[in-house]
Amino acid sequence: RGGPWQVVPDDVFQGQPYYRQPLTDPEQTPENFAVLVGDRWAATLQTSEYSRVAFYGGFREELPTFLRPIVPVRLLWRLLMGDTETYIGVLAHEAFHAYQGTVAPGRLAAAEFAAPLESRYPWENEATEQAWQAELDVLYAAVTAAPDDEAAQYARQFLALREERRRSGALSAEMVDYERQREWLEGLAKYAELVIQQEAGRSTDYAPLPAIGDDPAFHAYRTRERFWSQQLAEVRRMTNRSGETRFYYSGMAQGVLLDRFTPGWKAEAWSEDVWLEDLLAEAVQQAAPYTSNHGQTKL
């Protein structure tokens, strides 16, 4: 959206040169994503300060005038994005897109090429949204189930409901591809965003850099297990709203299940025409049926 990337003269960041891009239109700012700087993919993300300012201004503009003085916008920011760890996770999300561009540039391009289909997706179809809700409820149940056989059974049910939704809703091959592409692109990035925070929180020998120790919004990842649970719960809340955010969460949840049933799945995820749902189907088809405490097999 701007001019060529240029090395910032007479300055370095952590001993390395860094780049800037002149904007030709102040109304057209770069999105949070990955950019190609020369022949290198790199993450791009608003600074934490600018993100906060943009949130305050944008949120207030969406409110009716009479509500603007009384809605606690600053409190909402702290609840949604206030922790520094959350910002670091978002940066990991965008860095993962750069990794996708490095490892599988063709797949990244195809997934981005599919993005305009969002405007034609049947977000407002009531029957489709009801089917999506059932699908996501079962996906959440699979992710949170304790016994592996129960989780596998829920995962198989999720895949069956997905197939039935597409069939009964006469979803075109183009739209099916759109779902799969966006889950691969954004679902995997969401997975990376959350898992890296969870792993940091579980580390027993983590010590933050001194420079971040004085940040009052940084909690050394101690709040990340709670954040993980909150983010998993969002899987069930993705219907009855337009926009592709649901693919972030449905893709992420499939990644969590793949970790459970086939830990080597990540190497396969880069191959052409390999989708998360296909990897999951293969992973759970051999799992034993779930048997309840009463000895009854759950179908």
Please provide the spans of the model-predicted regions.
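Extended hydrophobic/aromatic segments used for targeting, binding, or gating
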Residues: 200-258
